[in-house]
Amino acid sequence: MNLLVELKKAALVFLVALVCFDLVPTIQAVSPPPDGCYPNYTTAEGCNALQHLGAGIGNTGVGWYSLFSAGNSNFNTGVGAGTLVLNTGNDNTAVGFTELLLNTTGADNTAVGTDALALNIGAFTNTAVGSFAAQNNDSSGAGHANFNTAVGGFALQANVDGSENTAVGAGALGLAKRGRPQHRGWGGSRRLHHHAQ
């Protein structure tokens, strides 16, 4: 009786193993499988992501044309369609759809949310969190709109050349086109508070 029980257990284990080995080649998470890693600690996934990467290191491009023109830039992360598409600057992070779209030489920028910092060209050390936050920052290309922080949808949206501004809340300082240095704004677009230091 003991021998019969042992044979049944062995047969069951054999059948389970056979089924597993038969199914393993057909199981895949995605098709086609991810491309894997590239030289210099770089990762790319998506149509034309990191297409023109040169000697740049530590870049991650995920999404359609993400970091397309990266060249020799370093330590950039673009996640989402069109993020950092023209970027050649360093240390930028863009997550969403078309964040830092026109950024070329700007560095140390962070954009999270649809069209956040989308028109920034050469300004640096800006943070925008929320849809359309700081959307027009440095759209003149002069590189003067630096050290700005915009948190909330449409916060600091119209800023072109103002520097050292902080806007927190939906629409905060959204209409300030050429803000003076160190403006602070909080609240929604209906209740806009601002304070210049």
Residue ranges of model-derived segments:
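Glycine- and small/polar-enriched repetitive beta-structure motifs of secreted/surface proteins
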Residues: 1-197
